[in-house]
Structures are given as structure tokens and as C-alpha cells.
Amino acid sequence: MNNVSENLTVILPKKQLHLFGYEYYFNSFIKLYQKYILPNVILLSGPNGSGKATFAYHFINYLLSYNEKDKYSVNDFTINPENKSYKYLCDNTHPNFSLLENDELSENIKKDNVRNTLKFLNKSTYFSDIKIVLIDNVEYLNVHSSNALLKVLEETNNKTFFFVIHNNSCKILNTIKSRCVEFKLFFTLSEKIKILKNIIKQYKDNFKIETIDECFYFFLRITSTSRRAP
């Protein structure tokens, strides 16, 4: 148990190369996008630690890398680490992507953060003609930042996509929710076990997991952090 704790290195959602358990949702989003009916403001709602951010980053990579070398693989739902957009996203430097979240010194997403998103939307695009905004932990919006965000959402065009991540144990303002198309992400117990096994395989080279207790301790550690490190 102690060895697991000491050697554990959590892979951030934006750096996860493999996507497990979201194949149905991913294929559904692809069909909507190819038919030009993918909602521009998508609310991903589900339990904390269920992989919503990882799913969002994978689909964002699919969109941004579509015409690039080493593009996203829809055959096995993996990101190529040599892909240009993946590298930019990992460094938070992709010109067509903006992350809106609370900063380290505050539990709230501030109005100034939303203003920065607006500035991003007013800039020209590069590499592709779409822009993407990921709003992590939307429940951290306060009244002022929510009002500012509403104005941004009202001006969204068909080349801009918002992925809004919501921990469904927390409440969000109805005014924000009403601007989104909500996708409630849910997994059965058997699906969760399958996902867990795949995640553990991903870490097998880091350390050896021998007992069931260690497996579940491992699972709790990698899914318990609500903040996404930069």
C-alpha cells in the first residue's frame, strides 16, 4: 500500500493518451459533428472523478487534429503523443483553445477569467477554423462571472464550441444550464470495473499492484482530485 502511494504519478486529463469507457459517447459526438449538428455549448454532467475532463480533452484533440499529421485515432480512442495539437494543449499554448477554470488562490471562477475568454474569442484562428473553450468545474462560477459568461455564450457562432464540465453533486445556475445541451454521463458497475482494469494496466510499469485493497486505493487516488493542475 505504501509503495503505491510513494510511486503514484497521476496523469492529468489533458495528458491522458488513452480513453476508456467513453466509446459510445465519443462515436455519438462524431456523428453529430459530421452532420453539422453538434451543439455549440455542451454540458458534460456526471460524478466527480468519472473521466469527464479526459473525455473532453480527447474529443477536443479529435477536432483540432482532424487535418493534422498524427491525428486522433478513432479506432482505439488514443492520442498520438507526436501530434502537434496535443503538444500545444499540454503546454496550454494552443491558439484555438482556451481553458476557463478557477485559479489556485480562489475557489471561484472570477469575472476577469471570463473576460480573458472573451478576448480569446475575438482573436483570429490558426491551423483550423474552429475555436474551443473548456470550462472546468462550472459550479465554481459566481454570480458576476456567470453573468459575464452568459454574454459570451449568447455571441457564440457555429465555429466555436464550449465544453462545460459539471460535477453533478454540485448545483449550477439555471441561467447557465439553460444555454447548454446537457449530456449526463453514467456507467454501470460492470463498466466501471472494466474501466478500472484498463486504467490500472496503464500504470503497471510504475509499480506492482498485488491486492484488491491496493487496486481500490489506487483508483481513489487518481480520481479524487477535483482541480486540474496546469
Show the residue positions of the predicted features:
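P-loop/Walker A NTP-binding region and its immediately flanking N-terminal helices
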Residues: 1-135, 161-163
